[in-house]
Amino acid sequence: MDLISVILISIGLSMDAFAVSITNGAMISKVTASEGIRIGLFFGGFQALMPLIGWSIGIKFESYIAALDHWIALILLSIIGGKMIYDSVKENQDHKDEIACDYAAGEKKCLNNKTLILLAIATSIDALAVGVSFAFLKVSIINTIIIIGSITFVICFIGVMIGKKCGKLLKKRAEILGGVVLILIGVKIFIQHTNILSYIF
């Protein structure tokens, strides 16, 4: 597989993570470069790790993974997205959700590592399936995952910064929008993998 193909695959795989990163940047009250780097590292790291796992598993479990990846993505994204929507509209603020933390200047929202891991896994499921195909293609897996991880990191960092600008306009609605975006991404992955629209139209 040539370098251009690997780069195009990397960009394609990072699009869901890019959309989520924009949402994260809009949702977080205090967005800094270090926060963008942290989010980028999580998404880039898992986007690189998943193909490696898929490559290791190989062709033996290809059909099994293809049958479940869309369900895993749909369930994870729907749960996280639904929780974000619920937490943004509930009246009782005594119990803060897991994506809230305190800054010295006051209470600000940020994404904790647990939430980022779940988001990173959910948006890198496709990369796991692609990694399986790498097992029987002539690719340098180490070089490939480095490229995938690096491109995803850069794209997600940019996404967070874009979200930071949008967040000034979205304000309190950012979390609701974020939840909707996550659910829609999950539905999109599900539709793409099941071809359900072909049965309707």
From Swiss-Prot:
Known role: Probably functions as a manganese efflux pump.
Record key words, sorted: Cell membrane, Ion transport, Manganese, Membrane, Transmembrane, Transmembrane helix, Transport
Subcellular location, record wording: Cell membrane
SUPFAM superfamilies on file: MFS general substrate transporter
Official protein name in the record: Putative manganese efflux pump MntP 2
Organism superkingdom: Bacteria
Family matches, as InterPro entries: MFS_trans_sf, Mntp/YtaF, Put_MntP
Native species: Clostridium botulinum (strain Hall / ATCC 3502 / NCTC 13319 / Type A)
Pfam families, alphabetized: Mntp
GO molecular function ontology, one term from the record: manganese ion transmembrane transporter activity
A single Gene Ontology CC term: plasma membrane
A GO biological-process term: intracellular manganese ion homeostasis
Membrane topology term: Multi-pass membrane protein
Transmembrane segments: 3-23, 39-59, 65-85, 116-136, 141-161, 176-196
Protein family per UniProt: Belongs to the MntP (TC 9.B.29) family.
